[in-house]
Amino acid sequence: MSIFLKFFLYLFFITTLFSFEQGRVVNTEIIEYESLEQIQSNIINELGNVGIVSQYGATIYRILYETLDGYGDSTVASGVFAIPDSEQEAFGIVSWQHGTQIERQSAQSNRGFDILSRAVSSSGFIFVASDYIGLGISNDIHPYILKEPSASSVIDLIRAIRNYFDEDISICLNRQLFLIGYSEGGYVTLAAQEAMENDFEDEFEITISFPMAGPYDLSGTMVDKMLED
């Protein structure tokens, strides 16, 4: 982490110690922009001509936002969001929950575009992805397969994105919300879905949820396995 970023986070902590708000935007910055032609070329180079219909160039941003850590205390997490290059339409949100990562530096907020963020944003959706607590900018312990902090990192990022677009009238959101995750991200997706449906039903309306290949009952499965003859 750079000295400047450490200093910025320290100042932020001091000035907001008594004004914490889940989903508050701390900072945003552009990581990179790719034109429609660049996105099409990069997708073809990586996947071949698989029929992905790109319609827009896109810009991907790094975002810092307020959320809760594994102990229920306030903290700052990082993530990304990518915006289609158009001010004429209202776009839905696609929230991607990534699989298991073991290094903070491998977080998407340190990498910018990948094939999924290119495909989603160039097709006319707002792509968002949390690094999770303990990855990316966060120095906290990563709460691996813990329901509440996993859900909070996703829900508060979506809140932060909505807050950001509320202040930027050039970008409009529609009501569509897609949750997609694989491996650890499958678990995180289901945790976020459960919290949205049970605790925040007036705030979120999920269009479709795709939790894939997640360890949904890790403790229960391991207990049965360990007690086998």
Where would I find each of the regions flagged by the language model?
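Catalytic-loop region of hydrolases
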Residues: 20-89
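Gly/Ser-rich "nucleophile elbow"/oxyanion-hole loop immediately N-terminal to the catalytic nucleophile
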Residues: 83-90, 160-180, 200-204
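A fold-wide structural signal in alpha/beta-hydrolase
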Residues: 93, 121-131
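Glycine-rich "HGGG/HGxG" loop immediately N-terminal to the catalytic nucleophile
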Residues: 134-143, 165
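Alpha/beta-hydrolase-fold enzymes
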Residues: 197-229
